[in-house]
């Protein structure tokens, strides 16, 4: 989806949400999705799956079949590079940069040499009260652990296929 069409569809989707008067968290509760995933769907950063269509249409009855069709196509998962200048996004990036090395070391200690997937991944934003009574933001990043593999030629399927003459 080209950038202009993506922006047009996104604007229409966000207008439907705005007209509904519902928050991302309310829509999440109605659809069984996380609030961040609902926001990603409406911003065309995630693909709407067929099983979710009825729940989303029930939560947002003003969604047209054309918009649903757009949401079901694979999204162009890009972002505006100027987005980093938005204060909330800047602070999230700053937090990851500040705590990143420590988080990585703890992942390595607890799991081994690997990474947290951003594909098999869940994210949510929650509001809680701190011990001081002030509102606190909880951002949960829940990703599958993926270990780095030792690159042994005996396990390299493309090499095995080349040697064996098969191309399946």
Swiss-Prot record:
The record's Gene Ontology biological-process terms are:
cyanate catabolic process; response to salt stress
This entry's Enzyme Commission designation comes to 4.2.1.104
Keyword Lyase belongs to the record:
yes
Reaction catalysed? cyanate + hydrogencarbonate + 3 H(+) = NH4(+) + 2 CO2
UniProt cross-references to InterPro entries, sorted A to Z: Cyanase, Cyanate_lyase_C, Cyanate_lyase_C_sf, Lambda_DNA-bd_dom_sf
Q: What NCBIfam families would the database entry show?
A: cynS (TIGR00673)
Q: Which HAMAP family match?
A: Cyanate_hydrat (MF_00535)
Protein name in the entry:
Cyanate hydratase
Lineage of the organism? Eukaryota, Viridiplantae, Streptophyta, Embryophyta, Tracheophyta
Gene symbol here is: CYN
